């Protein structure tokens, strides 16, 4: 049976208990255990790139990691992946900081990784690449003669041509992506956006609905919405509360809780969320003294100015809103710029009456799914969800809102706070059914199954396809 080789920017430590804290790690480990294989990625450390790979083997899985130099890490990861691709793919061209040296570093590191992986590959390996850090990776492997089946999954949104084509190197990136055999996206909108970008640049031949050829390269596109571990989350949420949390729950017995947890990131719509909550307090005064909104937003990329600006903005808005609407004995908004243990968050989800998840743009947003999975089915909370989160395509029984419309979000919060138990139970049951069916294992099994169905490339077939392909006419 073919081995599975997984490549990601970072690898989870070879400690199953630690890895289980993150959904992606669970899915990847499940796939690796089923097939046996290798997880290859950056160690998280800077140092001499020429050092031998660090290898750890447990059972039928090998972890192989490498160091990056300070320059390579800065150019590949900070300056290009996170200062160009991340904002552009989240529709924030105003925050893109394109620099040629960073682009060169991005390509250089992808080539370096291909060189390091090449000696580890076997002829029948199936290779699965993850996320925007590694868009050119298949191209680098093909240049080195690798004809194995290579799949790619994009965890973040794929932008429309108007956005993507603004990147100075968009044409190169698109052609490199076509070196993958299978391109997986979170939503159908993302898949179609990619094909639109491609069609604007070159002639694309579509043999069936999701099988295409461009630049003589045959590839398939498909949608694989990533899932979670609902049973594990329900187990964590239902366990006994720590003493401090139990005390807080008792103190807030007659207060309805609106809860959000997100990384401090401009894509998450946190300032817009605060302002929508202010509209709720202004237009629905009957809730004064009876609700509390808690926003947990741990610092992410704190050395980047755009992230510093959001943190200062949230601090100012929280103080202003509390100063305007707060009363003796009642603080309407709690903003915590801190990290909390994942298991504790699941318990907080369970006793929260409303889960507020309103990103401006998000590939999926697993927090929304985790909130649903953490609820008590007999007395569940209500999910208020942005239409621009990938999860909105599946969780259609949530209260779907436009995060840019403060009045709509405020009205949804009022509806959630006053919703009947029967409606809450019905909506929750519908969403939980979707989450259980499309869990993290279903996600990885579908992707790997589809990748296995693809006939491996050969040098002869690639050359034959090139002869039969013509450039797009002007």
Swiss-Prot record:
Fetch the Pfam families from UniProt.
Glyco_transf_20 (PF00982)
Q: Where is this site: Involved in alpha anomer selectivity?
A: 86, 156
User: So, what pathway does this thing act in?
Assistant: Glycan biosynthesis; trehalose biosynthesis
Q: Which domain of life is it from?
A: Bacteria
Task: Tell me the residue numbers annotated for binding UDP-alpha-D-glucose.
Answer: 22-23, 263, 268, 340, 366-370
Alphabetical UniProt keywords: Glycosyltransferase, Transferase
InterPro entries for the chain: Glyco_trans_20, Trehalose_OtsA
MF terms (GO), sorted A to Z:
alpha,alpha-trehalose-phosphate synthase (UDP-forming) activity
What reaction is this protein's catalytic activity? D-glucose 6-phosphate + UDP-alpha-D-glucose = alpha,alpha-trehalose 6-phosphate + UDP + H(+)
**Residues that bind D-glucose 6-phosphate:** 10, 77, 131, 301
**Stored CDD domains:** GT20_TPS
The transmembrane segments are none
Q: Which GO terms describe its biological process?
A: trehalose biosynthetic process
Instruction: Give me the disulphide-bonded residues.
Output: none
Q: What Enzyme Commission number(s) apply to this enzyme?
A: 2.4.1.15
Q: Report the protein's function.
A: Probably involved in the osmoprotection via the biosynthesis of trehalose. Catalyzes the transfer of glucose from UDP-alpha-D-glucose (UDP-Glc) to D-glucose 6-phosphate (Glc-6-P) to form trehalose-6-phosphate. Acts with retention of the anomeric configuration of the UDP-sugar donor.
The family line of this record is: Belongs to the glycosyltransferase 20 family.
Matching PANTHER family, A to Z? BCDNA.GH08860, TREHALOSE-6-PHOSPHATE SYNTHASE
Assembly and interaction partners = Homotetramer.
Please give the name of this protein.
Trehalose-6-phosphate synthase
Its lineage opens with: Bacteria, Pseudomonadati, Pseudomonadota, Gammaproteobacteria, Enterobacterales
């Amino acid at each position: 049976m073919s081995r599975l080789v997984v490549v990601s920017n970072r690898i989870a430590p070879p400690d199953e208990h630690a890895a289980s804290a993150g959904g992606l790690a669970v899915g990847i480990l499940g796939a690796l255990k089923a097939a046996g294989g290798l997880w290859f990625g950056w160690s998280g450390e800077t140092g001499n790139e020429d050092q031998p790979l660090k290898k750890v083997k447990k059972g039928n899985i090998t972890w192989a990691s490498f160091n990056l130099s300070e320059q390579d890490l800065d150019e590949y990861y900070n300056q290009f992946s996170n200062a160009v691709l991340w904002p552009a793919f989240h529709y924030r061209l105003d925050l893109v900081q394109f620099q040629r040296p960073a682009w060169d570093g991005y390509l250089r590191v992808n080539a370096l990784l291909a060189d390091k992986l090449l000696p580890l590959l076997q002829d029948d390996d199936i290779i699965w690449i993850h996320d925007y850090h590694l868009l050119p990776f298949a191209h680098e492997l093909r240049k080195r003669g690798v004809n194995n089946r290579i799949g790619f999954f994009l965890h973040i949104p794929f932008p429309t041509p108007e956005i993507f084509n603004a990147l100075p190197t968009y044409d190169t990136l698109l052609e490199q992506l076509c070196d993958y055999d299978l391109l997986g996206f979170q939503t159908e909108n993302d898949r179609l956006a990619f094909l639109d970008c491609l069609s604007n640049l070159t002639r694309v031949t579509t043999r069936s609905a999701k099988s295409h050829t461009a630049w003589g390269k045959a590839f398939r596109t498909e949608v694989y919405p990533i899932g979670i571990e609902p049973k594990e989350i329900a187990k964590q949420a239902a366990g006994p509360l720590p003493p401090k949390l139990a005390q807080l729950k008792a103190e807030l017995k007659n207060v309805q809780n609106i809860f959000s947890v997100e990384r401090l990131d401009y894509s998450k719509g946190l300032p817009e969320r605060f302002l929508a909550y202010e509209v709720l307090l202004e237009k629905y005064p009957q809730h004064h003294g009876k609700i509390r909104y808690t926003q947990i937003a741990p610092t992410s990329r704190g050395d980047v100015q755009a992230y510093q600006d959001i943190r200062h903005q949230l601090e100012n808005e929280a103080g202003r809103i509390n100063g305007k609407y707060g009363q003796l004995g009642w603080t309407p908004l709690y903003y915590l710029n801190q990290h909390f243990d994942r298991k504790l968050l699941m318990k907080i989800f369970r006793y929260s009456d409303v889960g507020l998840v309103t990103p401006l743009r998000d590939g999926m947003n697993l927090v929304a799914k985790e909130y649903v999975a953490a609820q008590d089915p007999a007395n569940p909370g209500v999910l208020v969800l942005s239409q621009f989160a990938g999860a909105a395509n599946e969780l259609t029984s949530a209260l779907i809102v436009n995060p840019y419309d403060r009045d709509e979000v405020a009205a949804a919060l009022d509806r959630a706070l006053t919703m009947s138990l029967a409606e809450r139970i019905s909506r929750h049951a519908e969403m939980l059914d979707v989450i259980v069916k499309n869990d993290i294992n279903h996600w990885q099994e579908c992707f790997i199954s589809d990748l296995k169905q693809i006939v491996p490339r050969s040098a002869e077939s690639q050359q034959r396809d090139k002869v039969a392909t013509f450039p797009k006419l002007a």
